[in-house]
Amino acid sequence: MAFDFKKEYKEFYLPKAKPALVTVPPMNYLAVRGKGDPNEENGAYQQAIGLLYGVAYTIKMSKKGDHRIEGYFDYVVPPLEGFWQQEGTDATDAIDYAHKEQFVWVSVIRLPDFVTKADFAWAVQEAAAKKKQDFSAVEFLTVEEGLCVQCMHIGPYDREPETVAAMD
């Protein structure tokens, strides 16, 4: 059975409806940085998602090709995640949802630990060759968040501030 990050790391991927502390260890990601309204049709955010999944599935399906990744095991591609901020603010400032065009984001998909920077570079080149598309915006990113507060937000994005306030 394929390794499923959501099931194996429930504390990170299935947060409770009430705020809770969690220590997030260093993790490697595929990442694309951008700016703008994520709801814009064919906008930068939509394009970033396509790039991320293109490389993510190239790595996952490497088992069927000539490129062998040491330590590879079958897995479910982890969910899309993101780090959001608004232009001209810092991480502690509230987001103004009326101005989504000012969003600055880093969209990410977690990588299994067996994926090296060399495997990542191969996957970017392979995806570009197969899809006839530029994947140079995709980067290998290591993030160590450390001690965090998390809470499942249920509802429209415009009501997210209520969930964030509950974590204060």
Predicted regions and their residues:
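A solvent-exposed interaction/effector surface
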Residues: 1-168
